[in-house]
Each structure stands twice: as structure tokens, then as C-alpha cells.
């Protein structure tokens, strides 16, 4: 074979566009090098086999060629175990390399846009600030906004993150080598060395184990989360602040003040014990210590680098008296450098930071040599020292130095402190109830058990105990393991706050909160650990955050908060939290419960009603969006998603989870990471400070249409998932759900409890499974039937369509709903899904369910096109359409292989090689899809 066709998988459309030429060249280059690696290490026959499978899969997809399907079956049926593994790995790495090329091209296009002096784009802080200034918002109002705002992506360790650290590191190396070719005029010799390095990296990838050999521990997940601080957060977050300040300065006649730190990173990794028995009090302490060790290591490195560069001599410059005083307390420098006061100051900081690290994190991180310096009491003391340096530089003609690395370090300290990230605690309300029940029964004056109490009796007892000063827990009583474990966690939380500050552990989330009782039960346990106090001196060192997850809970959450705010004791405690209450909304469980349309609509309505309740009581609202990477779990473009929130529901406050493989996709590359963070900031600024109210639908007709669509979509979804006899069997046999449980990609079990019921399955593997078999029903099912029924009942199709078309044009919520569904439909593939359906042993069940899925898919596409006016999927998003076209030739063969492997495995071939190959296909398809869980 003279032409390496694997290197020629490029976009089929728009190939004449010059802007995409570098992308095509990168894909060809990487494809050729991987093909050469396969030839060299596995032989020409293996390369030919991979190419034959790819071409046959393409024919099956694009031409719906039945003969191609049979041919593919024949090829796959006759693969040896060794061939199967090699083929899966080949397509997995083609997917990975195409992702690298695509990410690089995004950065390339953005840089070209900036070099050309083009207007700033949507999602940039530059455009967001220009828009608010143009609307008459002055700099003082902006400063006030930043002083009150909080924008916080929260990293979670949910089990769809399948890439190993080794693979991520080589991704970055390959991307760096491609950037070198792109941005540097290389000599022929340098180009040759660059290609050799690329080939070496790709060959190393081929010879690196893709899968983890053992299941991740929570400690592993903590370490995996920390790598993104090195990749992106530590450098890019200060860059964003500097950019905002520089933009504000251009709009002022004087230097812009240092704005408050509003963009911060949060984490659940090591604090989320809902359904994870491996998160203990020791693990939570380990997470806090690792966080602190990492950020202090960073400060120590930065202070050392800056100090080495600060060679300013007193013979040529003057310094302030406060800097001279600070320098006098530092350890001595060599006599040859005694005239360099800034170096003396930074040496003093360096020794104090080492002492601080040894005090806060003595057992983790780097082991520094002991010194006699006094540790910093807190990060504010370190900031104070840096401010002395900055003031001295500015007052003595060294302003440029004050605006560089020192400015970024000072901002980093303000953002990350000595704790790095705010760690959330989370536990299920049922566990709280179980612990409180035991405490009640140990202290009961009668023979009644806690579950026997009425709701009113529980509330009365809980409030009474919250106001009492003495604890319920007694050293003379024996408690169950669960109760002891929960109490140890909360006592450790108090210790972590004492060592690292309240900001290190500021939030307590109650999963499956359904009423005020669940909030009071959690409050009582927090009181037992000294984290909360009711009564005259009411206070709390944590935010108590109810998480509303099911459709019924979303519908009732505003009433719950109304009842909670009517309790004077709770309101008094809330004043110690700046009168701010956070509420978390669960996109994932509500979707599994009620489907895509109803989940989105009920969350939107809940936000509207919560905003009304909070405004009525004068309480500040912060919404925490518990979403995943896929549309079925609340994912989708962040900019459009935030702007689609109801007016008044953002108000400068937003937290949102970043989960699974999305963390790697968003934050491995620093430029892409910065752009994603900027998008959150820009959308929050615009949503809060611009008149979004004017563009939201306020007519009763819009809401009535959505109510009817939601009700119909809910019925269609529930009929399929919960009312179809043996639907669980269809799900388990037509997806790799059982095999996902054996893949070492997370520390948590895939189900909350041993059960085959859909209700007990965690949402992440539920969505992950539907993504892997390319059906993706959590992202669209029910919409088509809903519109079809609504149009039929209305009688006048044209009038109804005109109204929904207007909703699409003018209502951000409806527009985002359809846009996200459009994306999922484009990624789905019912041809491939039909092959997974063939794994279902009950032919009648298979025929019934898959016919329902296919019919609904066709209805969704039909009405999506009718409302949007489009004639093809992703018509208004050519960049994403191109991306999917690039990736599908790599993903499809892995799906076909996965079906064959599942068939073999479930037929009794339990060879380790088959099991590993199945796991490789799960990894490969997830890599290709990029947001699968």
C-alpha cells in the first residue's frame, strides 16, 4: 500500500477553506506517524487490517450498506485476541491525536483572530466589559460587582475520567512539538529533530499502557485533580485578573485598582462521601494537606525565581522604609549582595514559606530542610509582605517590575491562599437521618424512635437541640460505625478549618434534600462538631447547601426554602454567612428521573421561583449547578448556558461542577483552559450587569407551551424507561454498563446500593452507557413526541410553528435547549446503536424498544428542523460539525469492535485479553466523544 490512507482522514466539507488547512496538515502528519509506528512495531498486515476495518465502517455509516455490515461482522468475528487489542489501540490513538490537532487549531484560530485585530468574540472578558461599559456601567459599579461576586468551577472525581496521567503528559508533549512547528521558523535540521521527537512521543504512546491496572483510590483522584493547577489554574487565573484590570485601566484616567478576587476553584475530591465509603476523615485531611503542600511549593518556587531576578542595588535605587524594615529581618546574604534589599526580602519570604509548609503539611509534598524562620500565620500575612514590595517598586521608578511576575504572584496568593481550593463536603440525607436517629434514641426520654416522630415533632426536637449548648454525643455511649464515621469527618472538618482557615472547607452539601428536616438534621450534626451554633450567638463556619435532584424535589424546592427562611433561628445563623444561602440543583438525577426536556424546564422554573422567594426574604441567592459533561447531565456550552438562566438568578454568584473527562478536555491545555475560565467570567458579567430581562420570554403563552411540551415529554420518557416491561434488561444488554463496573476509572461504586433498578443506578454510568452505544437518549428523548402531540392537539400547525420559531429566536432558554439537543443528535448514530441492540437476547423486547427509540429520534430531528429552519444537524455550528466529521471515522470502528467483544464475552469467552479489549474500547470511544459522562 503506497498511500498511508490513515493519514488522510480529514474534514469532508469546507476543505477549500484556507483557515482549516493547518488542521488537515496536522492530522495527516500525526496519522502518518502513527501509521508508520504501527507498521514498524506491529507489521504491514496489521496496518492493512486497521485500514480495511476503517473503510468498511465508513461504508456502513455513510451509505447504510448492508453488505458492508456483513463484511464488518466477518472481519471482526475472525480477529485474534492480539489483533483485536492492536486494532482497538490504533483507533484509540487516532482519536487522541485528532483531538490534539483540533485543540491546537482552536488556539491557532484564536491567535490569528487576535493578530488580525478583529473585534473581540462572544465569551471573552474584553467584549463583556465593552458591552457593560457601553451600557453605562461605570468602573465603581464594576469594582462593586467583583467585590460581591463568586465564580467557581468545582472539580469532581466522577468515574468517567478514563485517561492516565502518563497519557496526558504525552498529549502535552505532542501539542508542544506541534506548536513549535506552527510558531517558529525552524531550520531544516530543527525540523528534522522536531519530527524525530514527534515520532518518539507517538511510539512511546503506542508502547504505554492505556488502562489502569488497579482501581483508582481516592488518593489517586486527589493527585489527578491537582495536575490541572500546574497545567492551567496557577498561571492562567492571575492572567485573567490582570487582563480585566488592564481593560478597566483603559476606561479610566488613572491606574485601575486591584479588583477583588472573585474567580476561585473548588473541589469535591476527598470531601464527597455520598456513596463513597472510601472518603474518610483521614482522606479529607490528606486532601487538605496535599492542596496546601502544592500551593506552598508553587509559592516557594516563584519567590525563589523572582528573588533571583531582583538584583536592584541601593547604590542606584531607593526603597521605602517599610521595605527596608522587612529586609532587615531576613537571613543574611553574601557580602557581595548586601546592597540588594529586594533579594533580602525575597530570601526572607522563601524561608518563612518553607517553615509554613513544614507546619501545615509535614507529611506530604516536598520535604524541606528545617529552618528557624517563623511560619506565616496565614496567607494575608504573606500578601502584606508582597504589598510592601509592590509599593516600594511603584514609589521608586520600578513600576514595570511591580506589574510583572510579582503582580501575578500576589494575585495567586489572594486567590489560592494557603489552601489552594475550597473543598466541599457532601453526604446523602439518608445517612444524616440515620445518625440523628441514633443520637435521638441514645438521649430519648421516652420509648419512641426517631422515625416514629411526625414531621412537626422532628422539627420541634431538632430546633430545640440546635439551641441547646450541651452536645448530644456522649463519651459514655457506644455508637454504630456509620455514626462514628460521620462524627469523625465533621470533627476533622473543624480541625482543617483551624489549620488552613475557614475558606479551606466552607461548604456542606446535603444530597437528595427533600425538606427542611433534612437541612436541620445536617445542621445538628455540624453543631456537634462545633461548626455551627444557634441561639443568641448564632454563627456557622460552613454554608449549608441543600441539593435538589429529582423532578418532585425541583418542583418543591422553593417551598422548602420559604419554610426554612420562616425559622427565626435559621435566619439569625444565616446573618453570620453574609445573609447568603446557596442552593444546588441536580441536572443528572432529574434527567434520569424525568428526561431531558422536563429536567431542563423544571430546573429553569425552580430558579425563577427560588429567586422570588429569596428576594421576598431579602436573602442573597447563589446557585450551584450540579452538571456533567453531556447534555443529558446538564452539559453544553457554558456561555450560552449561563446567559439562558432566568433574570436575577445569577447576580454575580455561580458555582458549577466540572466532571469527568470534561476536566481534561477543558483544562489540560493552558490556552483552552484560560478561554473556558474567561467564558464563565464573561457570561456572569453579562448576565448580571446587562438587561437580560428584556430578552427573556415573559408571555404566558411561552410558559404554557413549555408546560405542555414538558408534560408530554415526561410521559414519553417515563413510558419508555420506567413503564416498559423489562426495559432494564434492554439497557443492561444493549450497553456496556456491566463492563463499565470493571473498568478502573473511579473510586466510587456504579450503584448506590446492590440493585438492578434504574432508580438505584448512579446517573454517571447511566449516561456514560448510552453515550458509548451512541444512542444518547438522555440528551433528546421525548422532545419529538412532545412537539408532535402539541401540534396535533393545537390543530393549526402553522400558527403553533410560528410561535415556537419565535421562542427559538428570542428566548435564550429555548434556544439553548434546542441547540444542546442538536449537538447530541449529531453525535448519536442509530446505525451503530442498532448493532448494540442486537446484543439483546429477547427479540421482542429488542424490536419494541429500539423501534420506539428510532421513531422518537426521527420525530426529534423532524421538529428540530421545523422550528429552527435548518435542513441538517449542526447547520449553525460548522466548527462542531467539522469536529464530529473528523472524529467519527476513528470512533465508529471501536463501536463495532466493542459490540463484537461484548458478544464474545457474554457468550462465555472470559479471557483476560477480551476483558482488557472491552475496556480499551470504552476508553477509546470516550476519548473520541470527548464528553461522554
From Swiss-Prot:
Keyword Magnesium (UniProt): yes
Gene3D superfamilies (UniProt xref): Phosphoenolpyruvate/pyruvate domain (1.20.1440.90)
Stored SUPFAM superfamilies: Phosphoenolpyruvate/pyruvate domain
PROSITE patterns: PEPCASE_1, PEPCASE_2
Catalytic reaction equation(s): oxaloacetate + phosphate = phosphoenolpyruvate + hydrogencarbonate
Keyword Transferase recorded: no
Cited InterPro entries: PEP_COase, PEP_COase_bac/pln-type, PEP_COase_Lys_AS, PEPCASE_His_AS, Pyrv/PenolPyrv_kinase-like_dom
Annotated catalytic residues: 158, 592
Cofactors that this protein relies on: Mg(2+)
Highest taxon of source: Bacteria
A single GO cellular-component term on record: cytosol
The protein's Enzyme Commission number: 4.1.1.31
EC supergroup of this enzyme: lyase
MF-aspect GO terms: magnesium ion binding; phosphoenolpyruvate carboxylase activity
UniProt keyword list: Carbon dioxide fixation, Lyase, Magnesium
GO biological process: carbon fixation; oxaloacetate metabolic process; tricarboxylic acid cycle
Residues in coiled coil: none
Family in the record: Belongs to the PEPCase type 1 family.
Described purpose of this protein according to its UniProt entry: Forms oxaloacetate, a four-carbon dicarboxylic acid source for the tricarboxylic acid cycle.
Name of the protein described by the UniProt record: Phosphoenolpyruvate carboxylase
Species the sequence originates in: Nitrosomonas eutropha (strain DSM 101675 / C91 / Nm57)
